[in-house]
Amino acid sequence: MEPEKQREGFGSRLGFILVSAGCAIGIGNVWRFPTVTGQYGGGIFVLFYLIFLVLMGLPVLTMELAVGRAGHGAARSAYKALEPQGSKWHIHGWFCMVGCILLMMYYTTVSGWMLDYFFRFLTGNFDGLTSEQASGIFGEMLSSPVEMVFWMAIITVAGFIVCGRGLQGGLEKVGKWMMSALLVLILVLVVHSFTLPGEAARICVLDTFVAVCAGLIIFPACFSFGISPDAGPSLIFITLPNVFTNMAGGRLWGTLFFLFMTFASFSTVIAVFENIIACACEDFGWDRHKACIVGTAALVLLGLPCALGYNVWSFIQPMGAGSTVLDFEDFLVSNLLLPGGSLVYLLFCVTKWGWGFDKYAAECNTGDGPKMPRWVKPYFKYVLPVLIAVILVQGLV
């Protein structure tokens, strides 16, 4: 029982909400959501997105939070505290840790791109460049192994330095500051974007708010300068730098945008790092200092295939011609581990072979706030697993 007594918790509910939202808010909110929205009907897509956010995303989120709060630990130890005696649900805890590590094997590289571009705009590297020259900088960055590894390592080291200061003194303190700054930045960028010429359950709300606001930044800005918004990295590192180089005060707005992107990605990095550290401390008996040192070294090494996959190891094309290591790692996380993990959490919380719906609902109803009604039980037990299984299968075929 001694490790449980020493386990640090969040200092405030606001800190928990902002850190959790920081983990959810990331690169996909900016380089995927706005483009997919434009491709699939605009407001109609957002409407259906919000419906499924409530029908699928929110229930699974409550399950993860309930397991963590009731189990008082990281994934594996929380499962062990709640699972029926003799069952093996805690094995999924190892997959949770592997998923976090796999995510960080490429996410630190992409976060490094954001930091790189922030400093490029801050120091005026884009000043006076033509559209072709601005577009070429991204390719030059990808082709440089030294630059790619350098920024990836900077993000990794910085993330573990923050987490090394403890949950409240590190992740919560920095996360609250970064998320507050991120929300201010995105509001400033939205307001500025609309001044350009031309026509153009709280964690879930914040995540969706940032995604929608990203669209309000990107589309008016692109259309004002006659530039078609792309998807993925091309949107962030080719399309938008072209917009900023053609815009009055582009250096300032480019700097603020990539500062926003750095905050969005780094808030995810430190939240996932904290999860990795918690797992290492609880499962291996390490102290936080050792977990941070080992984690830094391990993730810098494990991040090399992604960072070097665009240059010296570009011959590795795991998903066919033109693919990269990042594509493969992202496929494993997004198409297999995330929906698969959601399905396991769901089955653990609603079946009699796991924690059970009644205990899960009782945990959700602990404390103040809205209560979980009993009528959702059939939906959670019989409909929601099928919906998530369909997403899992669809992502793999």
Regions inferred by a protein language model and the residue ranges of each:
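Membrane-interface "cap" regions at the ends of multi-pass membrane proteins
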Residues: 1-31, 60-65, 69-82, 86-91, ...
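Extracellular loop-to-transmembrane helix junctions
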Residues: 37-63, 147-148, 338-339
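Inter-helical loop and helix-membrane interface segments of multi-pass membrane transporters/permeases
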Residues: 4-7, 35-40, 70-95, 108-168, ...
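C-terminal membrane-solvent junction of multi-pass transporters and transport-like membrane proteins
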Residues: 92, 284-296, 330-388
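Loop-to-transmembrane helix boundary motifs in multi-pass membrane proteins
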Residues: 15-17, 149-150, 205-214, 251-254, ...
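Select transmembrane alpha-helical segments in multipass membrane proteins
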Residues: 9-20, 45-48, 87-101, 149-155, ...
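Membrane-embedded translocation segments of transport machinery
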Residues: 2-6, 10, 176-266, 270, ...
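Transmembrane helix-boundary motif of multi-pass solute transporters/channels
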Residues: 14-52, 224, 234
